[in-house]
Amino acid sequence: MKKKIVTFFILLVSSLPIAAQNFRVGVTAGTNVHSSTNIDARMGFSIGAKSEYGFNSLDEGWYADASLLLESHAWKVDFGDLGLHLYKSSRQYTTLWYLNLPIHVGYRFPVSQDVKMLVNAGPFVGLGLFGTSKYEIVFMDGNTEKGTIYDNIFTAKDALGRKIQNRFSWGAGLRFGIEVKDKYQFMLGYDRGFNKFSSLFGNSRMNLFSASVAYMF
């Protein structure tokens, strides 16, 4: 029994350098545009860390990709004058900050000596941290009024007592792009939310288009 335990630990320790060769971490940052029914997109941002594990090798073939991102989702809603003819326009601006965790599986294949193509897809989960909602009204005389509707929209409720903004989000995403010199990654992405992110809009599932860069160590 002792020999089996010793043999197990020897095999485990000897495999660590191989596993380390197939694993690496990096940093990433990017921009995104949040689109959904009844809202107008605004630009958001993301920053965080990521890791990769090559099932056989990080040079090519199948790999796993996971990131931990601080990400903002922003949009606006234009209400016009609501038919009251009291002002020229009225808008609501909302910015949310999430901690997002996408876990993808992808494939890497060489295009040239220094360039590789990357494609990956998988689920994500998000936790809403904080967010504000503000308004802007332009009156008929040209004067403008600005103010805050919700200081933290994740804790706010509507007139029926419903949460206005869901704190948790989940869905699936797709990424594709290139890697240069095994260090620099340039990616385009799309994420689709499977749950409603707001009670104010009927079909409020997230559609997030993104562009990002990463540096792998």
Per-region residue spans from a language model:
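Glycine- and aromatic-enriched membrane insertion/assembly motifs of diderm outer-membrane
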Residues: 24-26, 34-91, 97-99
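Extracellular loop and loop/strand-boundary signature of outer-membrane beta-barrel proteins
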Residues: 33-38, 86-92, 158-162, 196-200
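Outer-membrane beta-barrel "beta-signal"
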Residues: 205-217
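Flexible, surface-exposed loop regions and adjacent strand-edge segments
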Residues: 81-87, 135-143, 203-208
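Outer-membrane beta-barrel transmembrane domain signature
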Residues: 55-57, 61, 74-76, 94-185, ...
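Transmembrane beta-strand segments that form the barrel wall of outer-membrane beta-barrel proteins
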Residues: 25-37, 41, 188-199, 203
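Sec/Tat signal peptide C-region and signal peptidase I cleavage site
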Residues: 16-20
